[in-house]
Amino acid sequence: MAKDLRGVMPALLTPFDNQQKLDIESLRRLVRFNIAQGIDGLYVGGSTGEAFVQSRAEREQVLEIVAEEAKGKVTLIAHVGTVSTEESQQLASAAHRYGFDAVSAVTPFYYPFSFEEHCDHYRAIIDSAEGLPMVVYNIPALSGVKLTLDQINTLVTLPGVGALKQTSGDLYQMEQIRRAHPDLVLYNGYDEIFASGLLAGADGGIGSTYNIMGWRYQGIVKALQEGDVAKAQHLQTECNKVIDLLIKTGVFRGLKTVLHYMDVVSVPLCRKPFSPVDEKYLPELKALAQQLMQERG
């Protein structure tokens, strides 16, 4: 089971229309576009997917649509985390019902929960997932939950946990986790250190910019497997040039704008309170879309 979870997996964006409603046709196109890139799986309903500005019904609808398009073609991981254990359990049940391969959940946030409360939260979700492995999602910069190494070690050894999405930027900690848990599936979370994360022990990655250049990240994996560190470094540099621009524009809206210019996403808007891309960046984003389309062929 754990073997199937390894690889390069875009953190899927969620397209919306001009009325801020889910854009189902754009979502279907985006799933097909990602699969055509040769990625290994999709991570659905996470931070990149703007899950926390969606209702539970909307999140379930996204899971259903993605499963219709991708089940049996690539590995599917449903992020079901919310601050509410009950709602997370309901989403986990939906993920099982729609045929996902695993569930994932960010640490519960906003309130200062005790570590034992975090553990109980994960146990409850795992029970509701009916046998699907859990991918623990550690992202302290957004969750505000700063887990110690000992706490991470405890979480990843809970019955039912099969993987960790490590979005902390701490490569030393990544290596420590790998050393302590050689059989754990370990994902690099920050795209800008993907190659370094692999060298520190990650089995693959889950990232937002994979939506527009997943083949580059697959190229990094292949280069390192072949011992070509220079090629991996070159590809990481090319990815980071894109990330530099997206950080200026706002990552999610920048990605949607690039995908709009690629004729994948109809409306390049995130859900409010996110604002649209500043128009001054549109020429650069359009040029990036053209460059990536030419590179991909």
From Swiss-Prot:
Protein's recorded name: N-acetylneuraminate lyase
EC number(s) stated in the UniProt entry for this protein: 4.1.3.3
Gene for this chain: nanA
Reactions performed catalytically: aceneuramate = aldehydo-N-acetyl-D-mannosamine + pyruvate
GO cellular component: cytosol
Function: Catalyzes the reversible aldol cleavage of N-acetylneuraminic acid (sialic acid; Neu5Ac) to form pyruvate and N-acetylmannosamine (ManNAc) via a Schiff base intermediate.
Subcellular localization: Cytoplasm
GO molecular function list: N-acetylneuraminate lyase activity
Chief localization: cytoplasm
InterPro entries xrefs: Aldolase_TIM, DapA-like, NanA, Schiff_base-form_aldolases_AS, Schiff_base-form_aldolases_CS
Active site: 137, 165
Family: Belongs to the DapA family. NanA subfamily.
Keywords: Carbohydrate metabolism, Cytoplasm, Lyase, Schiff base
Lyase is among the record's keywords: yes
Residues annotated for aceneuramate binding in this entry: 47-48, 167, 189, 191-192, 208
Assembly mode: Homotetramer.
Pathway(s): Amino-sugar metabolism; N-acetylneuraminate degradation; D-fructose 6-phosphate from N-acetylneuraminate: step 1/5
